[in-house]
UniProtKB/Swiss-Prot annotation:
GO-annotated biological processes: cGMP biosynthetic process; receptor guanylyl cyclase signaling pathway; regulation of blood pressure; vasodilation
Tissue-specific expression: Venom gland.
PANTHER family referenced in this protein's UniProt entry, alphabetically: C-TYPE NATRIURETIC PEPTIDE
InterPro entries registered for this protein in UniProt: Natr_peptide, Natr_peptide_CS
The protein, known as: Bradykinin-potentiating and C-type natriuretic peptides
Alphabetical UniProt keywords: Cleavage on pair of basic residues, Disulfide bond, Hypotensive agent, Metalloenzyme inhibitor, Metalloprotease inhibitor, Protease inhibitor, Pyrrolidone carboxylic acid, Secreted, Signal, Toxin, Vasoactive, Vasodilator
An example Gene Ontology CC term for this record: extracellular region
A family per Pfam: ANP
């Protein structure tokens, strides 16, 4: 049944095509397959990326922190150090130590830069310790600033604290608070 419908629709299409042409011969454009003239592919020559200098960032500028750390304490100074006769008094002490740096600009500037690079500070360690430690509770109460009823065990109680069910610590009266051990 399906094949007969397909054959009937094919014959109908051929009949309509013949009627639309009205017996005229095929035109030249319909004798061959119409296609657009596509030019052949052109190979593009790309320039290679330029090499960056050692102190140049990809954005084209210089990184101030990297430059300050690589050049040493002299880079932290706004003005070059005074020469032998460039001191305020022109004394021999200024001539004896021409490379002496002031505390406010030289040593502290480089230590401040290295302090900024440090990732794990004391405060971060304290916060992490509070999150990780299971003994300290966040609720208020208890004495000594340890947080909720945390108390320091001494002597034999300290040794027995780890002898609980599943390696958990026992509470003060020696039970596991409903774990069923």
């Amino acid at each position: 049944m399906f094949v007969s419908r397909l054959a009937a629709s094919g014959l109908l299409l051929l009949a309509l095509l013949a009627v639309s042409l009205d017996g005229k011969p095929l035109q030249q454009w319909s004798q061959r397959w119409p296609h657009l003239e596509i030019p052949p592919l052109v190979v593009q020559n790309w320039k290679s990326p330029t090499q960056l200098q050692a102190r140049e960032s990809p954005a084209g500028g210089t990184t101030a922190l990297r430059e300050e750390l690589s050049l040493g304490p002299e880079a932290a100074l706004d003005t070059p150090p005074a020469g032998p006769d460039g001191g305020p008094r022109g004394s021999k002490a200024a001539a004896a130590a021409p490379q002496r740096l002031s505390k406010s600009k030289g040593a502290s500037a480089t230590s401040a830069a290295s302090r900024d690079l440090r990732t794990d500070g004391k405060q971060a360690r304290q916060n992490w310790g509070r999150l990780v430690s299971p003994d300290h509770h966040s609720a208020a109460g208890g004495g000594g600033g340890g947080g909720g009823g945390a108390r320091r065990l001494k002597g034999l109680a300290k040794k027995r604290a780890g002898n609980g069910c599943f390696g958990l610590k026992l509470d003060r009266i020696g039970s596991m608070s409903g774990l069923g051990c």
